[in-house]
């Protein structure tokens, strides 16, 4: 891993942050040993966003940290305007560091006459000036293919798995919430040397509608401590999985997710006996009111992002990040 200090980067390097997660940007800067670039961002009374770059960046290699989390549209628009300002100020290259990629769940048309919003966002980012994208644990990995510029797809898997390994979860079992996350769960299971189980949703059509019948548990969970994994937690519906597992004789569950989207009503759903801890990262800020009585443990993704940024800036392989963590993941 990298060693902090100003010697890691040169004078052509600049790190900026938007207002979506300034704490993460500052932490990345601290690890790299650089101060954040000088930028003024304001919102006018009519909700328009104004940006002023307050230092010369001509010919510089720019990294702008801005997850497009809630409020998604405001933070996305702010990122686009910042990149436009950077481009017009003659930045040599602009890398958008988007730890959480909003609209990633709208990656395809589920029914007719729907947009593919993730593709639209990709087009907007490139049009605004992005030359490269860095993101973490996309909800749909195929979004990388929406871009014709380099896209570095990182994963928080090792960060989360290391924490769970130190917890010494007794008689643990990795649980995938659905078939789509099975491969991701398998990587967790390999890292933690634990068995794996799968929640399989069986559906049946009634009167022309698609109605969920039940979630079957494939695998042995009785007497074990489940670790339910996913890329994000939003509405809090994952609590149903925890309840189902406990009903089958499992211990209260850990939930391990990268992105704590946590909508307003989700915290009430997640504060229940079937869930003992939610382990997540700071790709999105988690305010105190969403800490769910201390059940939420937030790990820092800054070291991973700092390592990737430094390697890109120095034209080194980003895949080395994953080799160091003994993780095989598409980048």
Residue positions per predicted region:
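PRPP-associated nucleotide enzymes
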Residues: 1-331
């Amino acid at each position: 891993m990298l060693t902090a200090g100003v010697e890691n980067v040169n004078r052509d390097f600049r790190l900026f942050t938007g207002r979506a997660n300034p704490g993460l940007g500052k932490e990345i800067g601290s690890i790299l040993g650089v101060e954040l670039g000088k930028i003024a961002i304001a919102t006018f009374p009519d909700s328009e966003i104004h940006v002023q770059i307050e230092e010369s960046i001509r010919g510089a290699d720019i990294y702008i940290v801005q997850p497009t989390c809630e409020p998604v549209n405001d933070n996305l628009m702010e990122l686009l305007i910042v990149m436009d300002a950077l481009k017009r100020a003659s930045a040599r290259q602009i890398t958008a560091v988007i730890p959480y990629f909003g609209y990633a769940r709208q990656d395809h048309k589920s029914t007719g006459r729907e947009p593919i919003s993730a593709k639209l966002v990709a087009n907007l980012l490139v049009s605004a000036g992005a030359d490269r994208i860095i993101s973490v644990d996309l909800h749909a990995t195929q979004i990388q293919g929406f871009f014709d510029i380099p896209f570095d797809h990182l994963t928080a898997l090792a960060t989360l798995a290391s924490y769970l390994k130190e917890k010494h979860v007794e008689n643990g079992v990795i649980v995938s919430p659905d078939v789509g996350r099975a491969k991701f769960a398998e990587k967790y299971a390999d890292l933690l040397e634990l068995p794996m189980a799968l929640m399989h949703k069986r559906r049946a059509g009634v009167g022309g509608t698609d109605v969920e019948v039940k979630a079957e548990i494939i695998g042995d969970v009785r007497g074990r401590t489940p670790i339910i994994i996913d890329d994000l937690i939003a509405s809090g519906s994952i609590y149903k999985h925890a309840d189902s597992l406990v009903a089958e004789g499992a211990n209260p569950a850990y939930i391990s997710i990268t992105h704590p989207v946590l909508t307003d009503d989700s915290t009430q759903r997640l504060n229940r006996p079937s869930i003992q801890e939610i382990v997540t990262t700071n790709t999105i800020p988690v305010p105190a009111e969403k800490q769910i009585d201390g059940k939420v443990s937030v790990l820092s993704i800054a070291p991973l992002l700092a390592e990737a940024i430094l390697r890109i800036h120095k034209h080194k392989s980003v895949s080395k990040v994953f080799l160091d963590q003994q993780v095989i993941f598409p980048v």
